[in-house]
């Protein structure tokens, strides 16, 4: 429910393709781009922007398998294969937006881990994660513009 993702699933261990480019964490930036600047949430000359990392997924995969889960399959794969860490492609705290057929969650605007989880749930449809969020909470997130549904 925190927007972590991996290409590793039970029965399938695939590579990360171009994702190793995500493997660095540079906080400094010589030339700010408009997209990078748009990720700034507080007016402060020392505030930093953020790389846009947008997850675009359907709430369910083939075979009615939910995309949004509490624990990635990669965690179990790591345990059973003796890996020291789960092979996570992108950690949720790097994800700025989650876009599904339900709507978009502007995760970079979350003010807490709890709010981030609620924002993911708000666009997770009828998955267990999506059904775990209160309708009043979703309404408040929509009112604040942190979650937007198609009209």
Predicted regions and their residues:
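Conserved phosphate- and dinucleotide-binding cores of soluble alpha/beta proteins
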Residues: 1-151
């Amino acid at each position: 429910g925190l927007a972590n993702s991996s290409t590793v699933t039970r029965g399938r261990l695939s590579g990360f393709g171009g994702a190793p480019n995500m493997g660095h964490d540079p906080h400094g930036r010589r030339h700010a781009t408009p997209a990078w600047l748009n990720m700034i949430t507080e007016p402060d000359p020392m505030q930093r922007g953020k790389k846009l990392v947008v997850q675009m997924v359907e709430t369910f995969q083939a075979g009615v398998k939910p995309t949004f889960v509490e624990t990635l399959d990669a965690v179990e794969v790591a345990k059973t294969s003796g890996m020291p860490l789960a092979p996570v492609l992108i950690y949720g705290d790097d994800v700025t937006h989650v876009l599904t057929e339900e709507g978009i969650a502007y995760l970079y605007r979350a003010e807490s881990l709890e709010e981030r989880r609620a924002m993911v749930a708000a666009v997770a449809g009828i998955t267990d994660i999506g059904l775990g969020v209160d309708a009043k909470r979703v309404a408040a997130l929509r009112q604040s513009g942190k979650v937007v549904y198609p009209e």
